[in-house]
């Protein structure tokens, strides 16, 4: 009795996209690419959200505000990133806070991906699809979002400044074609 209840509880707590991957996407990719082993099938590894704050040189509090917004979007605490070395042209000193980042894995990664594809991307102004050439050659995909207010967690009235952000989707795919097939299966809206 207890085992049946715990199994049912874990099934309901599993993110929707993770269930879709385990039930349909994995089998489809295995047939498409002819993998012998289940572990060869590409899967999502992590999603990194990065927010660079250019105004950090004038006001050192801006990166911490960006980190708070990023934490709301991601659902976990963001880390303030610091400059590795000084660049006089940008008025940046070594170890100065210049942005924020979050690395999402496991359940939070799937939950964020669901919100990104189904809620945030359709809310982007003049959105015509994602660039299908933004793969890095090793099965990872990077994209930029110009306004972080497209996420439902951000209250537009309380935002004092709009920042852009990078979203990097890392996969275990060996080639860009495998990664493209994986992300298309997750309903990424690539341009034709």
UniProtKB/Swiss-Prot annotation:
One GO biological-process annotation of the entry reads:
translation
Q: Which residues form the signal peptide?
A: none
Q: Which SUPFAM superfamilies match?
A: RL5-like (SSF55282)
Record keywords: Ribonucleoprotein, Ribosomal protein, RNA-binding, rRNA-binding, tRNA-binding
InterPro entries referenced in this protein's UniProt entry, alphabetically: Ribosomal_uL5 (IPR002132), Ribosomal_uL5_bac-type (IPR020930), Ribosomal_uL5_C (IPR031309), Ribosomal_uL5_CS (IPR020929), Ribosomal_uL5_dom_sf (IPR022803), Ribosomal_uL5_N (IPR031310)
Which molecular-function annotation in GO is an example for this chain? tRNA binding
Please give an example of a GO cellular component term from this record.
Answer: ribosome
Q: Say which family it is in.
A: Belongs to the universal ribosomal protein uL5 family.
* Role, per record: This is one of the proteins that bind and probably mediate the attachment of the 5S RNA into the large ribosomal subunit, where it forms part of the central protuberance. In the 70S ribosome it contacts protein S13 of the 30S subunit (bridge B1b), connecting the 2 subunits; this bridge is implicated in subunit movement. Contacts the P site tRNA; the 5S rRNA and some of its associated proteins might help stabilize positioning of ribosome-bound tRNAs.
Subunit description: Part of the 50S ribosomal subunit; part of the 5S rRNA/L5/L18/L25 subcomplex. Contacts the 5S rRNA and the P site tRNA. Forms a bridge to the 30S subunit in the 70S ribosome.
Family annotation (HAMAP family): Ribosomal_uL5_B
Name assigned to this protein: Large ribosomal subunit protein uL5
Please give the organism: Mesorhizobium japonicum (strain LMG 29417 / CECT 9101 / MAFF 303099) (Mesorhizobium loti (strain MAFF 303099))
- The gene it comes from is rplE
């Amino acid at each position: 009795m207890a085992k049946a209840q715990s199994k049912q509880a874990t099934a309901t707590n599993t993110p929707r996209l993770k269930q879709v991957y385990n039930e349909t996407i994995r089998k489809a990719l295995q047939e498409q690419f002819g993998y012998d082993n289940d572990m060869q099938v590409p899967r999502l590894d992590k999603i990194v959200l990065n927010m660079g704050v250019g105004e950090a040189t004038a006001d050192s509090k801006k990166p911490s505000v960006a980190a708070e917004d990023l934490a709301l979007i991601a659902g976990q605490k963001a880390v303030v990133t610091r400059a590795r070395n000084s660049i006089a042209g940008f008025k940046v000193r070594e170890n100065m806070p210049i942005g924020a980042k979050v690395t999402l894995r496991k359940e939070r990664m799937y939950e964020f991906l669901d919100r990104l594809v189904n809620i945030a991307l359709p809310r982007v102004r003049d959105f015509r699809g994602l660039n299908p050439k933004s793969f890095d050659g090793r099965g990872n995909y990077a994209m930029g979002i110009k306004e972080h207010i497209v996420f439902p967690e951000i209250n537009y009235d309380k935002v004092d400044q709009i920042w852009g952000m990078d979203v990097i989707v890392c996969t275990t795919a060996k080639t860009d074609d495998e990664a493209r097939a994986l992300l298309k299966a997750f309903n990424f809206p690539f341009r034709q």
